[in-house]
Regions:
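N-terminal metal-binding scaffold of metallo-dependent hydrolase/deaminase domains
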Residues: 6-25, 30-100
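An N-terminally biased module of ancient metal coordination in phosphate/nucleic-acid-related enzymes
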Residues: 11, 132, 170-171
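N-terminal-biased segments
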Residues: 114-132, 184-189, 214-222, 271-281, ...
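Divalent metal-dependent hydrolysis catalytic cores, especially in the metallo-beta-lactamase
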Residues: 145, 149-156, 164-194, 199, ...
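Histidine/acidic residue-rich metal-binding segments in metalloenzymes
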Residues: 194-208, 224-298
């Protein structure tokens, strides 16, 4: 990069590279690369790198910053070779330097390498993605209770496609450089544990290149839908976090709802992941109550 390039120019250029380059994450099986530099990185040459140990040439790496008056004004970059072994970066080398001539080498085409990204709020178990296009149907004034009733009607229609669409959504995530996620999985009487079982089956198939935590999520209200027994079954079945939802506007009993959520977490030694959408004073009260509960719990 020229020393007089503006940061905006650099970011504009590198932004075009992120999508393809992020796929070089060490845990992702798909990468845009070419054997021995014969084909350069582009979206039409997607391939799998199956070699356990290899060199990746022409990788654009951020190496530092240029400063003006003590303020970083632009990023310095350089093309280098990355040595990867068993899914981990083991060395950075001068570009196209291969100390071990027996190892295969690939050409990254000058794309910017970035750390993998994480999606920490996604619902892999229920999505329209991968199915026919549908327009948003949420009239003005729709409440969360209205959405719960609508979802209770739609879930049986979505459930046969859970695995197929979760696979496609994971493909989309990986294509944008995301290899780690936390999926909130419906646990309520309509779905039972079926969504959890379907999601676990998909994640078992994708574990080589995709890591995902599962939140057992009482989407229809922990108390409102009487989901505590199912939540406990979900924790026994391997969910990683105990989910929670608006304890006042949905469950109608802030302290009881939060106490139940925390008790499940304590009983199974798991963390909590709660979605609190309440913008009324009830939301502040819920936050304060959770802080107090955490502080007094050993």
């Amino acid at each position: 990069m020229k020393e007089n390039n503006s940061r905006r120019e650099f970011l504009s250029q590198s932004g075009k590279m992120v999508t393809a380059a992020a796929l070089f994450g060490t845990s992702v099986p798909l990468a845009h690369a070419a054997v021995s530099g014969t084909i350069h990185c582009d979206a039409n040459n997607t391939m799998k790198i199956t070699d356990p140990h290899y060199y990746l040439d022409n990788v654009l790496l951020e190496t530092g910053f240029d400063y003006e008056n003590g303020v970083a004004v632009q990023t310095r970059t350089a093309h280098q070779t990355v040595e990867i072994q068993n899914g981990k970066i083991v060395a950075l080398r001068e570009n196209k330097q291969h100390p071990d001539a027996t190892l295969p080498h690939y050409d990254a085409g000058g794309k910017l390498m970035l750390p993998t990204t994480r999606d920490m709020h996604i619902h892999l178990d229920k999505t329209f993605y991968g199915g026919p296009w549908r327009s948003l149907n949420r009239p003005a004034g729709t409440t969360i209770q209205d959405m719960i009733k609508l979802e209770q009607k739609m879930l049986p229609e979505l459930q046969p496609y859970t695995q197929e669409r979760a696979e496609k959504l994971i493909d989309l995530l990986q294509s944008k450089g995301t290899t780690i996620a936390r999926s909130h999985c419906n646990i309520e009487p309509v779905s039972g544990l079926k969504n959890l079982q379907n999601l676990q089956a998909v994640l078992a198939r994708r574990q080589a290149g995709f890591e995902c935590e599962i939140v057992a999520f009482p989407q229809h209200g922990l108390l409102l839908s009487k989901s505590e027994p199912l939540m406990r079954e979900a924790m026994q079945a391997g969910a990683h976090y105990v989910g929670g939802l608006d304890p006042t506007s949905v469950d109608g009993a802030m302290e009881k709802s939060l106490d139940t959520m925390f008790q499940i977490a304590l009983d199974y030694d798991k963390g909590v992941d709660i979605h609190l959408h309440e913008t009324t004073p009830a939301g502040v009260a819920a936050i304060n109550y959770m802080v107090e509960t955490v502080e007094k719990t050993p």
